[in-house]
From Swiss-Prot:
InterPro entries on file: F-box-assoc_dom_typ1, F-box-assoc_interact_dom, F-box-like_dom_sf, F-box_dom, SCF_F-box_component
Annotated organism of origin: Arabidopsis thaliana (Mouse-ear cress)
Domain F-box: 1-47
Pfam families, alphabetized: F-box (PF00646), FBA_1 (PF07734)
Name the record gives this protein: Putative F-box protein At3g10430
Lineage: Eukaryota, Viridiplantae, Streptophyta, Embryophyta, Tracheophyta
Length: 370
């Protein structure tokens, strides 16, 4: 490769190089091409050392990827076949599972997409599925025995003719077989539809609502079972579930009236007993609301290791609220420590029909499963 550096050192450097740069470098020589394109071990080591970004889809035409540390904003066009309205996007290993409408009134479509590599795979319904529904719940993860054995979970609530109760009917899509199959996994609560689920280390997590308390519900793609892993703290109605430190959950809760925030995190999800503990609070009023408001979509956010919140959101500005600004926030216990405008739009109810302003995303070299 024309270098006097030891290959182990070169590997270490490449594993810490952004995926976007590596894709440009892979034509440098045959060895680098094989490493970046085909070496699964290298791909996953690179992924494990990659840092969180934000992904934003703008006007169905462009995808923006923002590095909140360097504040570098990369913009590229969206492939024509993906220029639709999205109402579900789930991130796992740099891959995005998306459910979208091709046109108003049509059945939704399902796709897996690597935004950096610009690769797409459409997931077709197959028996027992006839079509997808907008009311479907989705999960995205992998069998921990083989990390590249990715699976999709789909479930929806149907009435039981025998006792008229609601229960989820579940199917799994395996890329290895290219088809859906029914499974017997069940749980007896309801998913909180106001809070997006999150994929962490191959398993999917949601907030489950029960009459007296809430729980964190997980789906293990290895065992193909649902499990309640712990109670979910209950303070206020605005809630955001996320991945913390790569192997834990975070829960941001906000009081809409005062804008006060409590952030709780779990211990490692692999521990025998999992529970939340208070991480930090923010009590100042000059911080954004972490929910959608009128034409403003849901902010993207994650919890940092320095007891802070990193968010990319949209806010109305101007004398008559006539335009919006896209703003990167960093919020610590003492309040806002960073506020940078990264873009602007005219305020138009139709200009952006996304439910989310942005999504937490980690660019990767992982190919879209065939």
């Amino acid at each position: 490769m024309g270098s006097s550096l030891p290959f182990d050192l070169i590997l270490e450097i490449l594993q810490r190089t952004p995926a976007e740069s590596l894709l440009r470098f892979k034509s440098t020589c045959k060895k680098w091409y094989e490493l970046i394109s085909n070496d699964k071990r290298f791909m996953y080591k690179h992924l494990d050392k990659s840092t969180k970004r934000f992904l934003r889809i703008e006007n169905r035409e462009r995808v923006q990827i923002l590095d909140p540390v360097t504040e570098i904003l990369a913009v590229s066009t969206i492939p024509n076949e993906l220029r639709h309205k999205y109402f579900t996007l789930i991130h796992c290993d740099g891959l995005m599972l998306g459910m979208c409408y091709e046109e108003l009134g049509s059945d939704p479509n399902l796709a897996v997409w690597n935004p950096v590599m610009r690769k797409i795979k459409w997931i077709k319904p197959s028996p027992p599925l006839v079509c997808y529904w907008g009311s479907d719940y989705l999960g995205f993860g992998y069998d921990k025995t083989f990390r590249d054995n990715y699976k999709i979970l789909r479930f929806t609530y149907l009435g039981d003719d025998d006792d008229d109760e609601s229960y989820p009917k579940c199917q799994i899509y395996e890329f290895n077989s290219g088809s859906w199959r029914s499974i017997e996994a069940k749980f007896d609560g309801e998913i909180d539809v106001e809070v997006d689920g999150v994929s962490v280390n191959g398993s999917m997590y949601w907030i489950e609502l029960q009459e007296k308390k809430n729980f964190i519900l997980s789906f293990d793609f290895s065992k193909e079972t649902f499990n309640r892993i712990c109670d979910s703290p209950l303070y206020w109605d605005i809630k955001r579930l996320g991945c913390f430190n790569g192997d834990r959950l975070s829960l941001l809760q906000q009081n809409e009236a005062t804008r006060e925030i409590h952030v709780s995190v779990t211990n490692k999800l692999s521990d025998e007993v999992v529970s939340f503990s208070r991480y930090f609070s923010v009590t100042l009023p000059d911080i954004p609301l972490f929910r959608s408001i009128d034409i403003l979509p849901l902010p993207g956010c994650f919890i940092g290791k320095n007891r802070n919140i990193i968010a990319w959101c949209e806010q109305l500005v101007g004398k008559y609220d006539d335009h919006t600004s896209i703003i990167l926030y960093e919020i610590g216990e003492g309040g806002v420590t960073k506020r940078i405008r990264t873009g602007r739009h005219e305020a138009d109810e139709d200009y952006n029909d996304l439910d989310n302003c942005s999504y937490v995303y980690v660019p990767s070299l992982i190919p879209v499963p065939e």
